[in-house]
Amino acid sequence: MSSFRARWDDLPEREVLTNNFRTAMTGKETGVNRIRWIHPTVVPTHSHPDCEQTVIVTEGKIIFTVEDDEFTLEPGEIAILPRNVPHGGRSIEGEAEFIEIFAPTRIENLLGFVGSSSMPDPDEVTGA
């Protein structure tokens, strides 16, 4: 595979926690997720020992906790989390959407969810 592209709305979305929906796509070294939270959503504190995470909010607002610091992220705002940094989050109201980028990619991006591949069907992808 040299490269590919797809539309988020054409990829499968999975509910990975209550009211927390993920659409995943991956390259050789980078995983990208579209996350959609419907209030109320809570993601417990966790960390990623094997990758750095970038969060880019595109719709709505979320409360993000990084170590002992809590702040609101709004559309256009970005947070970058080095490996092993404890973080979590919760919804404020309504619906929020953000993009997560993981480098290197995580196993969740490679395997997809509930045993299905997160990779798009090659017949449905336009080469770039």
Features from the language model and the residues they span:
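Short acidic-glycine-tyrosine-enriched beta hairpin
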Residues: 69-83
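Conserved short histidine dyad/triad with adjacent acidic residue
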Residues: 18, 33-48
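Structural motif
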Residues: 61-63, 70, 86, 95
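Ligand-binding loop in jelly-roll beta-barrel domains
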Residues: 83-108
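A short, N-terminal "cap"/entry segment at the start of jelly-roll beta-barrel domains
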Residues: 1-31, 113-128
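Short, conserved beta-strand element in jelly-roll/cupin
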Residues: 37-38, 47-64
